[in-house]
Amino acid sequence: MASQISMVAAEYQVRAITGDEFIVIYTRGSATVKACLARFLRMFNSSTDEWVVGLDVEYTTVLESKKLLKEAEKKKPAMIQVCVHNVCLVYHICHADIECQDFKNFIKDERVKFVTVDFRNDRDVLGRIGLVVGQPFDLQKTSLVSSS
């Protein structure tokens, strides 16, 4: 049996407690990321609504004091979750097969508003691997979500 890290992609149908159904796509593969981004673009292009995406980032664990660490040893993105409507891409980026330029282009696209909570740390961590979010909308910074 292959380890879960070696698994390139899987798609799941998930029903929330509210009865809403979601499609969750888990991957570390750039081909799956590209296909999911194309799906998002088709969704955007078939709608007159603003292009809005939910964004969350999980990091690798750092056990030592950050002050003592070299840049290469600091926290890095482990998983990036990107959601449009009822489709969520869970990109295990720390185990990505190759760098996905399409993903870099997507998250820096100024047409897309990326909704986040407490984006300050996410911005720093994403920047460590050259990812820049073009139009973040931080719910906490705009006081739409409490900081406590």
Give residue spans per PLM region.
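Short His-Asn-centered micro-motif
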Residues: 55-57, 91-94, 115-119
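Short, basic, glycine/proline-bearing loop/turn elements
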Residues: 17-28, 82-92, 140
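Short, well-ordered alpha-helical microsegments
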Residues: 61-62, 99-100, 122-124
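Metal-dependent phosphoesterase core characteristic of DEDDh/y 3'-5' exonuclease domains
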Residues: 81-85, 106, 112, 119-148
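Nucleic-acid-processing active sites and adjacent nucleic-acid-binding tracks
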Residues: 87-104, 108
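A short alpha/beta connector and helix-capping loop motif
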Residues: 63-87
